[in-house]
A protein has these predicted regions:
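FNR-like FAD-binding dehydrogenase module
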Residues: 1-702
Length: 702
């Protein structure tokens, strides 16, 4: 039996690991009869052996525009091969799929749905129906766990029936009933290697820590265990061997009196680290040194210690690692001990490592690690964002061995930021009249991000700071930051490629290189990159006269958080792509108004005030007097109709998940009702067709 996962941030991996542990316990207790079980990322499993598996359990999330996670993509491509015979390839294989999704996203659980149907097409026999296999983060009764608990009960019941075992009704053991596992690794203290005694190369030490973790603990949400570590010489770097970029600028974009600090953070990249509009910059943040030192003291370790990790028999990877790693590097750059909340398994294991006199702590830990304590765990850990350090402080009797600390500590996840500048080398930046930051130092490539510094209070009024945004906020010019370039989820190819010779304004005609860009707050970042590129590329050419770009930006107040205001005003003044029906519209929610800037035929900028429609004509999605981007779309509906329908332009939306993408979609559908005479269902279907042909794309984040 195999348990396989596709996981981008670690949640699907955690579910898969937990399922595997429960299945192994069932096998040890003779509740089911299986020869062997395994758990791995899908990319680390040989798909050609899938027909040999009697039972396979899949757990997957959905990323981007309905894309599979990185550690599932190769496996998924194999399953899509046309050479695989339908209805017979997996005729002897029983499968179950569980999807981790969020119904506030347009592509809710689409990867799990596609995987389920493809396995069925290949002849696989489903153990649990599709409708019971979809978890939703938006479920008020425990998020995706509400569906996972019921799905697990059904799965285990089917396994007992198929494998001839008898058990406890398919329920996870209650609090205190879980037997302790052996750790996957053994940790040995070591001396600092002589070869590294004279020079400490942080980039190499980080790469080595990642390699050792993969070799001993398996994939753990990082790159494939079988993939070579990047040398650092590739154009964009990599997660395991990032390029250390120099911080060039760290400028506050918002007024000091504004509630949120938003910054323009710029870097000098390697000369070969080119990027395109829509790409993202991956950043590996460092944890605060004082908190890491506090954590190491709590577990009885020191920052300057060196250790050797090896696999325990039958645990982790089949090989062993003899590489010695630095504990300070491991817990500062690779494992997240000060920000991410530990998983349920931490509490299960921690309950076995309390003092004999601390029965209350032991019972509470066991409860938090059980199904019965899942709601308490959600409140204590997830909603309150308690880190591993804080959990250990709350339970002072816990004394975990170092091997368990390393195994249970969440992996430090890189953060991805949309790049908000166009790619320019030193000579281009020097001559760019729009650049107020000059050329990169040393002939590199300039890269700018628009970063909102995350600070908020939990339901219990605890102050929380986002790890990466606050890390960037505190950096001084000249600091080195580990980064790499990745492709984003927004596809701008038809805007960046050659203009079609002929275009049709009919519904069925070829779309023109026109677009509507909707980016409230820092969602404007990828569109600033795109516009900066287009303005430069189209300047003085025929394309500038035929391409039309209509931008919608939203913020709270014109005088406090109008991000990159001078850039947008200069672009409208200097480029014909902002001539009508193009333009730049800004909605100021707390000012309860907006404005739209358009380039006039004489090169001047025309400004038109935007306000809410009369109360009798309030859009259905407007419930307050605030003026949002959807209200600006409503006020500019004629221009929106021209670009979106008559010119068959594309629509791109970026920003926070939740209500905004839904309200924007409703506003665009209303445009078709108003100007094309469609009914509401017709307009909804029109937007759906745009989504299917990638004319409507959404990049949203929580």
């Amino acid at each position: 039996m195999a348990v396989l996962y596709g996981s981008q941030t670690g949640n699907a991996e955690e579910v898969a690991e937990d399922l595997h542990r429960q299945i192994e316990r069932m096998a040890r207790r003779k509740e089911i009869n299986v020869d062997a079980t395994s758990v791995s990322a899908m990319n680390d499993f040989d798909p050609a052996t899938l027909p040999l598996q009697k039972f396979v359990v899949f757990v997957t999330s959905t990323t981007g525009q309905g894309d599979p996670p990185d550690n599932m993509k190769a496996f998924w491509r194999f399953l899509l091969r046309r050479s695989l015979p339908l209805r017979t390839s997996l005729a002897l294989t029983n499968f179950a799929v569980f999807g981790l999704g969020d119904s506030s996203y347009p592509k809710y659980n689409v990867v799990a749905r596609k995987l389920y149907r493809r396995l069925e097409d290949l002849g696989g026999n489903p153990l649990v129906g599709l409708t019971s296999s979809l978890g939703d983060d938006q479920n008020p009764n425990g998020g995706y766990f509400a569906a996972l608990d019921l799905w697990t009960d059904q799965l285990f019941h089917k396994l007992r029936e198929a494998c001839g075992g008898i058990g406890n009704g398919g329920h996870e053991p209650t609090a205190g009933a879980i037997d302790v596992d052996e750790s996957k690794i053994v940790v040995e203290r070591a001396e600092r290697p002589e070869a590294r005694a004279s020079q400490f190369d942080l980039s190499k030490e980080i790469a080595l820590c990642h390699r050792v973790l993969r070799a001993t603990l398996g994939n753990q949400g990082q790159a494939s265990a079988h993939a070579p570590v990047d040398s650092g010489d590739s154009d964009g770097g990599s997660k395991e061997r990032p390029f250390f970029a120099q911080l060039r600028g760290n400028e506050m974009l918002t007024a000091p009196s504004h509630a949120q600090d938003v910054r323009a953070v710029s870097f000098d990249l390697h000369p070969r680290m080119c990027y395109s509009p829509g790409d993202v910059l991956g950043i590996l943040p460092s944890q605060r040194g004082d908190l890491v030192a506090e954590f190491l003291a709590r577990i009885g370790a020191r920052e300057d210690e060196w250790v050797r990790l090896r696999c325990r028999k039958d645990g982790g990877s089949s090989g062993t690692s003899q590489d010695v790693i630095h504990l300070g590097t491991l817990f500062t750059h690779c494992l997240d001990c000060t920000s991410a909340a530990p998983r349920k398994y931490f509490f299960q294991i921690a309950s076995f490592f309390t003092g004999v006199e601390d029965a209350m702590e032991r019972e509470k830990l066991a409860e938090l690690g059980s199904r019965e304590g899942r709601d308490d765990l959600h409140q204590y850990c997830t909603r309150e964002r308690r880190s591993l350090l804080e959990c250990l402080q709350d339970f002072p009797s816990v004394s975990l061995p170092l091997e368990w600390v390393i195994q249970l500590c969440p992996k430090l996840q890189p953060r991805l930021f949309s790049i908000s500048s166009a790619c320019r080398d030193a000579s281009e930046a020097e001559n760019d009249r729009q650049s107020d930051r000059g050329a990169p130092i040393g002939g590199g490539v300039r890269c700018e991000l628009t970063v909102a510094v995350v600070r908020y209070k939990t339901p219990w009024k605890r102050e929380i700071e986002g790890l990466c945004s606050n890390y960037l906020r505190d950096l001084g010019v000249g600091s080195s930051v580990p980064v790499w370039v990745e492709s984003g989820t927004l596809d701008f190819d038809h805007l960046l490629g050659p203009q079609p010779e002929e275009s049709s304004a009919s519904l069925g005609g070829e779309r023109e290189a026109c677009a509507i860009l909707i980016g409230p707050g820092t969602g404007i970042a990828p569109f600033k990159s795109l516009v900066e590129h287009l303005v430069s590329a189209a300047e003085g050419g025929e394309r500038a006269r035929t391409m039309k770009i209509l931008v919608f930006f939203g913020c709270r107040s014109r005088g406090k958080d109008y991000l990159h205001r001078s850039f947008w005003e200069e672009c409208v003044r200097g480029s014909e792509i902002f001539a009508s029906p193009g333009g730049f519209a800004a909605a100021f929610s707390r000012d309860q108004r907006g404005e739209v800037l358009t380039r006039a035929s004489d090169g001047s900028v025309e400004s038109r005030a935007l306000g809410r429609a009369p109360a009798v004509d309030l859009p259905s999605y407007s419930t307050t007097n605030k003026f949002y981007v959807q209200d600006a779309i409503d006020a500019c509906s004629k221009e929106v109709y021209d670009v979106m329908h008559l010119r068959r332009g594309s629509v791109y939306v970026a920003g926070s998940t939740g209500q905004m993408p839904r309200d924007v979609r409703a506003a665009l559908a209303k445009v078709m009702v108003r100007h094309h005479g469609m009914g509401e269902s017709e307009a909804d279907e029109y937007i759906r067709r745009m989504e299917a042909t990638k004319r409507y794309q959404v990049e949203a984040w929580g």
